Amino acid sequence: MNEDLTLEEKIKQLSSDPSIGRIVSVTGAKAIVLLDVPRDGAARATADRPEMGTLLAIDTATTVVLAIVSALSVPVPAQRDGESEIWIAELGLVGELWRLEDNGFSFNRGVTIYPALGDRVRVAGKSELRLAFCGTARSVSVGTLRQDVSIPAMVRVDDLLGKHFAILGTTGTGKSCTTALILRAILKENPAAHILLLDPHNEYATAFKEWGEVVSPRNMQLPFWLLNFDEIVEVLIGDPERKAEIEILQELIPIAKGKYATSRNGEQASSQRLRRSPNDPSRYTVDTPVPYRTSDLLKMIEQRMGMLENKHDLSPYRAIKHRLEQITQDARYAFMFGSLTVSDGMAQILGRIFRVPVNDKPITILELTGLPPEIVNVVVSVLCRMTFDFAVWGEGQVPVTLVCEEAHRYVPASTEAGFGPCKRAIAKIAKEGRKYGASLCIVTQRPAEIDPTILSQCNTVFALRMSNDKDQAIVQSAVSDTGSGLLEFLPALGQREAIAFGDGVSLPVRIKFDDLPADSLPRSSTASFSECWQRCDSDEAFLERIVERWRASGNEVEEDNTLSLLADSIQFDGAQSTKPADGANGANGHHAPQPPQLQSRAQQPAQQTARQTYQPRADAGPSANGRSVTSLRRQQTPVAPVAEAAPAANTGSALQALRDRLNQRR
């Protein structure tokens, strides 16, 4: 600046010159700027003052280089008023705008033409911010830029989903709202999406009322035969060291699958595809996802027990038999073991979980609360494995996204923690899912406790406020040097703020997320202790309601599943099925479905057999939601010889009533 200028001329020139300094060093992807120091009473506008994270522009002959401020310092501060001092800004070079023949610009990530020493630096203008952060790719808006709230923060959908993403932040920083906001923005522009969200706290149903298919233990159908061998061993045995029991299952399950296939195909069992003996285990493996009956498994176990001479060898057989009988009578496992009939409904199960067809419900919210704690990891493992296999065998024609909330539960960093098959299933999606159209979203409050292999595969990260040093270090390791300066903000980020970096956004950026509508918020708000503790509105009646809901929850699950089981075993044509009992072929060579507790006794005389039937009896007390609860009691009743059933006069109305009750619950 010319020293002969008057003070007024200096101020006028400073105010008209958009530059804020000049390049004095360039090293790889970094540069250092010597900032112009306002003197003689001159002051820059607030918008022209560089801050941490501010996007700056550097004009070259053919491009405009874009850089992010990563550090600010005054290495030589003034000792007295009026003395000169040196202001330094450290930059990370992140992209460039190429000048086109039509005087327009094209944004490219990365830098091909580096700034030269002495090049002037200025704060990026609105048009440059729009070119850099909005772009032309298929994008959705999730908020605004911290640097300029008039510029929308855009997320590129294909890059976000195709290469996996993570949402990280301390408890209470808005992870659930951020997850809901991003997914809602995607669904709004992509109504034929296929998203499966694992919801361990039952909080997302309210966030996707118009788009979500809610699956809970009350209406879930995940038959046991969909489990692979590791998963069924976890359910029935639970200890991988019990080798004898594992070997028994490994031998008998393929045979049980063969028995079901033979009975289902009847005369087709002699075709070329099923020419071998039904007891030939080589036709099926323990992992083949085909139906089989627990009754067949129990029969074979009992047969083996009868052939053993040494009573000491009975122990593993008894353990499996006891567990099978116990679990099939446990209402909590009804979604897996409760069906009175076994049928091959795999296509229908896949359709409901992965929304094929979409039917205006592009997201499935699978609520895990209410599942037995010991089986949650198994259910998650099955769903994650099915997600990958669905994508593989669908040849990528229907891309699907798996959202894993509280992911540190399922893919912990410790090799000794977690359920191995579950970790392997999620890792497989993370490593190989991109090639087949299976994407992964990881949501967690403890990045340091996540398997680093999984987190390293997430090419886009939304980092909300974090104060833990270990968590910050994990995030830091995932960021390139050019955006590392932004992470200094992590402990000081406000509500609804995040640092976003990776392939899903054009450049590392600090985002202020949009507000969600009040009726679309997840049920994840923090309890107001101070408000609740100022009034006394809890009494003995309140405790009674808690106890009633606590106890009724299991009964309602049992009732809902039992109604479904009854519907499965009844033909809605006015009469019960008159097909032969399971174990005896009908005229067409098929086996009729029969409750599993009868199948194991099919060889006994009918008049000597007792079975457990569900008989409804209305209890006097109301349920947790205020309506009458019909509890279904198991009672021992004799089984009459099979005979042709004549339709009763009122059978049709009774069955219609049952159908109506089922439809109301669904």
Predicted features along the sequence, with ranges:
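P-loop NTPase motor domains
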Residues: 202-206, 212, 225-428
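Glycine-rich phosphate-binding loop of nucleotide-binding enzymes
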Residues: 139-222, 500, 530-536, 540-543, ...
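Conserved beta-strand position immediately N-terminal to the Walker
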Residues: 165, 366, 441
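Substrate-engagement module of ASCE P-loop NTPases
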Residues: 185-189, 386-392, 423-440, 484
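Conserved ATP-driven motor cores of ASCE-family P-loop NTPases powering translocation/secretion/packaging/pilus
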Residues: 233, 238, 427-432, 436-514
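Conserved P-loop NTPase motor module
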Residues: 496-666
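Loop/turn-to-beta-strand initiation segments
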Residues: 192-195, 361-363, 397-401, 436-441
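Basic- and hydrophobic-enriched, low-structure N-terminal and domain-boundary segments
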Residues: 1-168, 395-398, 413
